[in-house]
A protein has these predicted regions:
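Cytosolic regulatory regions of ion transport systems
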Residues: 1-62
Length: 62
């Protein structure tokens, strides 16, 4: 299954890791560059931007 996690802070990254461990495809949406980079370094696909904006969600293929 494919999941989009909005926010790559402590809770968002933990959620993404658990989902990935369960075999799911996970994309993170994050507006903070440092957090986005952290998600990428953990091997996640990351879309940078505000997760409440429709254009950003479209980039994440929602």
């Amino acid at each position: 299954m494919r999941f989009i996690v909005i926010g790559a802070g402590r809770v968002g990254l933990r959620t993404a890791r658990v989902l990935r461990e369960e075999g799911h495809d996970v994309t993170l949406v994050e507006r903070d560059t440092d957090r986005a980079d952290r998600g990428r370094s953990d091997g996640f696909s990351v879309v940078e931007g505000d997760g409440s904006r429709e254009d950003v969600l479209a980039k994440a293929a929602v």
